[in-house]
């Protein structure tokens, strides 16, 4: 016996052990050890667990101090009832049990591998997938939580561990697929990426988990974040209410998921991220920034695009309702700043209808793509000479400020045209009632418009048109004015017919006692006039500090307009 032990410890151990079958699944090793100690001292009792599910297989091995005790246990305990089952006690040295027995204990020459039995590379992915799928949800959640803590606390150690255990990295990726954290298609693309890290186990393409664990790990461990070969739609990532426990599960130590920018800058394509980035998406290993299909379209203002239809990709975003210059430091239209304004073609309930001052053939809901200076012209208020008939340009060449003719009234007419634009913008601002900055801007423009109207009424009184002090002022000035002061090129028809001395239909000067060009309807004081008067007073009371707080374009335009008003009022 001693010679046998020296010759082969495994055989000696098998002779001192018995195989115990038909064990109830709820039985513990301690309970079984108590039963088998009835025939003699028990050295150890080992229940055999399923490596994939972690559940007991229903059999185990009991080791005694000598072979005689083992034989006694087979005679006396075979058929012993335990928890409603008859235990089967047999010789552990039989061929059927020899392989299981060899894996028990440290005395055997075949030391149990910490990774379990050796599996062929072809079967490794399927085996890992089965093992992961058999885990209870609670255990899988706990595993992910522990892995997250491991990566957060010791990123380098976690990386080394996953590099040395590729099957663990593959299992973690598979678990993310099972938990619907990672889409299977994305997981496949991660596995089949080309990497420079040599794979430890080669895998054949099979099912969703078609690459071997070595392939999975070598990819997962890669610290690079290359983009996926083709753009993925947003629906490719599923969270389904899973907590962000995997946010850093394979971060830092594994392939840290690239933070996808949450803001889309400019009209160019950008990576799209829901709710602040993909990092909160439970850190898919090595995912990198995933270009979304919806990010391939130039990201122009959605509300403007909805009103005007899609613009060509090479057309810059129209600048906005404040008439921002193209170099507006805010980097966008007022729509993108406020987000609460009406669509571009909106005129408000008092005067709905399509704007009549657009180039024919262009969508009347907004300015043409090349018009970037100001918002759409609106129909004038009822104050502005409605009885004259259609508001299309009826003035002919004398009112085209580009020519510089008729120096007597061009300055006042250009300023009046700008005032009409301001009133149109004021109408939209009064309808929106949303943004303080826009309201203040509109008030300033309305104040300037009303000042111009009063000034023109004085200059166009019984004395007739008075030459402007500076001579002709082109009404097509584009400068930094916050409103479109006129039209250039194809927008010439945006000039609104207002007071002039001659050449207008039903709007000539109506005697010395009435300001020229005013229709009878304009002499009626409406609540809107009172409101505008209050706004004028507010703007006139703006201090230099308040004006200095405005954006550069608006501030400069206000100063220029004030200078113009002062020069006009100081004229003889």
Curated annotation (Swiss-Prot):
- Location of the region described as Interactions with CSTF3 and SYMPK in the Swiss-Prot/TrEMBL record: 108-248
Q: Which sequence positions carry the modification called Omega-N-methylarginine?
A: 308, 463, 470
Q: Which Gene3D superfamilies match?
A: 1.25.40.630, 3.30.70.330, Transcription termination and cleavage factor, C-terminal domain
Listed GO biological process terms: mRNA 3'-end processing
UniProt biased composition (Basic and acidic residues): 360-373
InterPro entries (UniProt xref):
CSTF2_hinge (IPR025742), CSTF_C (IPR026896), CSTF_C_sf (IPR038192), Nucleotide-bd_a/b_plait_sf (IPR012677), RBD_domain_sf (IPR035979), RRM_dom (IPR000504)
User: Which parts are the sequence repeats?
Assistant: 410-414, 415-419, 420-424, 425-429, 430-434, 435-439, 440-444, 445-449, 450-454, 455-459, 460-464
**Superkingdom to which the source organism belongs:** Eukaryota
| SMART domains to which the protein is assigned, alphabetical | RRM
Give yes or no: UniProt keyword Transmembrane: no
Start and end of every RRM domain? 16-94
User: Region (11 X 5 AA tandem repeats of M-E-A-R-[AG]): which ranges?
Assistant: 410-464
Which GO MF terms are attached to this record? mRNA binding
Cross-link Glycyl lysine isopeptide (Lys-Gly) (interchain with G-Cter in SUMO2), where in sequence = 189
Location in the cell reads: Nucleus
Region: Disordered; residue ranges are: 208-230, 322-382
List the SUPFAM superfamilies hit by this protein, alphabetically.
Answer: RNA-binding domain, RBD
Residues modified to Phosphoserine? 14, 519
Cellular component, GO annotation:
cleavage body; mRNA cleavage and polyadenylation specificity factor complex; nucleus
The record's section on Pfam families has: CSTF2_hinge, CSTF_C, RRM_1
Instruction: List the residue ranges of the region (Interaction with RPO2TC1).
Output: 509-572
Q: Which segments does the entry list as coiled coil?
A: none
Role this protein plays: One of the multiple factors required for polyadenylation and 3'-end cleavage of mammalian pre-mRNAs. This subunit is directly involved in the binding to pre-mRNAs.
Give the multimer and partner information.
The CSTF complex is composed of CSTF1 (50 kDa subunit), CSTF2 (64 kDa subunit) and CSTF3 (77 kDa subunit). CSTF2 directly interacts with CSTF3, SYMPK and RPO2TC1. Interacts with HSF1 in heat-stressed cells. Interacts with CPSF2, CPSF3 and FIP1L1. Interacts with DDX1.
Indicate what this protein is called per its UniProt record: Cleavage stimulation factor subunit 2
* Protein's organism: Bos taurus
- Top-down, what is the taxonomic lineage of the species of origin? Eukaryota, Metazoa, Chordata, Craniata, Vertebrata
């Amino acid at each position: 016996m001693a010679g046998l032990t020296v010759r082969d410890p495994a055989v000696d151990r098998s002779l001192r052990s018995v195989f115990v079958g038909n064990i109830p699944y709820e039985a513990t090793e301690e309970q079984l050890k108590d039963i088998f100690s009835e025939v003699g001292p028990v050295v150890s009792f080992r229940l055999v667990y399923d490596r994939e599910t972690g559940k007991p297989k229903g059999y185990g091995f009991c080791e005694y101090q000598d072979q005689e005790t083992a034989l006694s246990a087979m005679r006396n305990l075979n058929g012993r009832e335990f928890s409603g089952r008859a235990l089967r006690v047999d010789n552990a040295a039989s061929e059927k049990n020899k392989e299981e027995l060899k894996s028990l204990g440290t005395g055997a020459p075949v030391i149990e591998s910490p990774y379990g039995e050796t599996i062929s590379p072809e079967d490794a992915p399927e085996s890992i997938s089965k093992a992961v799928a058999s885990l209870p949800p609670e255990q899988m959640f706990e595993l992910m939580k522990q892995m997250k803590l491991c990566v957060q606390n010791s990123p380098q150690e976690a990386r080394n561990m996953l590099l040395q255990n590729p099957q663990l990295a593959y299992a973690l990726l598979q678990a993310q697929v099972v938990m619907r954290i990672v889409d299977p298609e994305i997981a496949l693309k991660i596995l089949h990426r080309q990497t420079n890290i040599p794979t430890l186990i080669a895998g054949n393409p099979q099912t969703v988990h078609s690459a071997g664990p070595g392939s999975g790990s070598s990819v997962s461990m890669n610290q690079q974040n290359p983009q996926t070969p083709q753009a993925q739609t947003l629906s490719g990532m599923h969270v389904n209410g899973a907590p962000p426990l995997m946010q850093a599960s394979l971060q830092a130590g594994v392939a840290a998921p690239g933070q996808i920018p949450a803001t889309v800058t400019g009209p160019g394509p950008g990576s799209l991220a829901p709710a602040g980035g993909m990092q909160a998406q439970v850190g898919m290993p090595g995912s990198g920034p995933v270009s979304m299909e919806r990010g391939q379209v130039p990201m122009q203002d959605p509300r403007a695009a909805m009103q005007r239809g899609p613009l060509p990709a090479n057309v810059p975003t129209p600048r906005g309702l404040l008439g921002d210059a193209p170099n507006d430091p805010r980097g966008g239209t007022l729509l993108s700043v406020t987000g609460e304004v009406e669509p571009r073609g909106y005129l408000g309930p008092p005067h709905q209808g399509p704007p009549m001052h657009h180039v024919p053939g262009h969508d009347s809901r907004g300015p043409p793509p090349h018009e970037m200076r100001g918002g759409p012209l609106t129909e004038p208020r009822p104050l502005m000479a409605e009885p004259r008939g259609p508001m299309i340009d009826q003035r002919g060449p004398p009112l085209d400020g580009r020519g510089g003719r008729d120096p007597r009234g061009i300055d006042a007419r250009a300023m009046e045209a700008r005032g009409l634009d301001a009133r149109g913008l004021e109408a939209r601002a009064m309808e929106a009632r949303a943004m303080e900055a826009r309201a203040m801007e509109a008030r300033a423009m309305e104040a300037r418009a009303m000042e111009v109207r009063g000034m023109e009424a004085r200059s166009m009184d019984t004395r007739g048109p008075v030459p402007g002090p500076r001579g002709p002022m082109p009404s097509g000035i584009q400068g930094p004015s916050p409103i479109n002061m006129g039209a250039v090129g194809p927008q010439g028809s945006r000039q609104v017919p207002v007071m002039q001395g001659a050449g207008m239909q039903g709007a000539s000067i109506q005697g010395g006692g009435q300001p020229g060009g005013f229709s009878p309807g304009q002499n009626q004081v409406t609540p809107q006039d009172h409101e505008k008067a209050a706004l004028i007073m507010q703007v006139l009371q703006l201090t230099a500090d308040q004006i200095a707080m405005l954006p550069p374009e608006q501030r400069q335009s206000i100063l220029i307009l004030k200078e113009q008003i002062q020069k006009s009022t100081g004229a003889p």
